């Protein structure tokens, strides 16, 4: 995924009201960005460090600028736009990057499934193969060298694990795919210290036949894409 037009940068001042962030440009001007991340963004906020943002030419938008990347104090980069995760996975699937998920003929997005009124992020289908239901989660929380998900209690995430277990019980292929949008994260684990119920459900899901994958992103100010598989420590 290329950032076009090119991203611009500023220094983070603060994030507030969940969906807003104030930054300061090089000339001292302060502007407000839309923050496209509904999570807590725990350990992803570094006031004074460089942020990268995109700009929309849609005159109907209240906030023309969208926060895309955060630079860490060690020089790493974090993909702030959690909504990019599904598009990154679709792009990677089309290129055959996710080797565990090759060999399917069709890809659909946001298809209704399960028994809790859910929509699957990605559905892969092929003749003479079980359908493959993929839930995509963006992982950005880094603590003591370990990547974790979720970064806050996630009832929605718990529901999705139950849905995946249900699909696996019906004979379908069920996959939980973590998209690691943090260049300093090299493995992913459930955040039992934040959401113990999610961690317990994930263990049950694996025992029920749900596959758990994680892929790291390569991130720069010009592009972001899925690149390499990394371990998941369930």
Curated annotation (Swiss-Prot):
Q: What is this protein called?
A: Sugar fermentation stimulation protein homolog
Gene name in the database record: sfsA
Q: Which InterPro entries match?
A: SfsA (IPR005224), SfsA_C (IPR040452), SfsA_N (IPR041465)
Superkingdom of the source species:
Bacteria
Q: Which CDD domains does the entry link to?
A: SfsA-like_bacterial
Q: Which organism is it from?
A: Shewanella sp. (strain ANA-3)
The top of its lineage is:
Bacteria, Pseudomonadati, Pseudomonadota, Gammaproteobacteria, Alteromonadales
Per the UniProt record, one Pfam family is SfsA_N
Write one Gene Ontology MF term.
Answer: DNA binding
Q: Which family does it belong to?
A: Belongs to the SfsA family.
């Amino acid at each position: 995924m290329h950032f076009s037009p090119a991203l611009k940068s500023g220094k983070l001042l603060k994030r507030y009201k969940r969906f807003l962030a104030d930054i300061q440009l090089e000339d001292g001007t302060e502007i407000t960005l839309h923050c496209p991340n509904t999570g807590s963004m725990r350990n992803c906020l570094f006031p004074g460090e460089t942020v990268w943002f995109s700009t929309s030419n849609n005159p109907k938008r209240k906030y023309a600028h969208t926060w895309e990347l955060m630079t860490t104090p060690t020089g790493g980069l974090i993909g702030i736009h959690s909504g990019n995760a599904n598009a990154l996975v679709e792009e990677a699937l089309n290129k055959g990057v996710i080797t565990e998920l090759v060999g399917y003929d069709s890809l659909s997005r946001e298809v209704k499934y399960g028994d809790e009124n859910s929509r699957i992020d990605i559905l892969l289908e092929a003749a003479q193969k079980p359908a493959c239901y993929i839930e995509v989660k963006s992982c950005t929380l880094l603590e003591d060298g370990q990547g974790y998900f979720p970064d806050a209690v996630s009832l929605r995430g718990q529901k999705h694990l139950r849905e995946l277990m249900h699909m696996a019980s019906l004979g379908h292929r069920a996959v939980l795919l973590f998209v690691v949008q943090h260049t300093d994260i090299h493995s992913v684990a459930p955040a039992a210290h934040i959401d113990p119920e999610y961690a317990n459900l994930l263990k049950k899901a694996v025992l029920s036949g749900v596959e758990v994958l994680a892929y790291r992103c390569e991130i720069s100010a010009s592009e972001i894409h899925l690149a390499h598989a990394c371990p998941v420590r369930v």
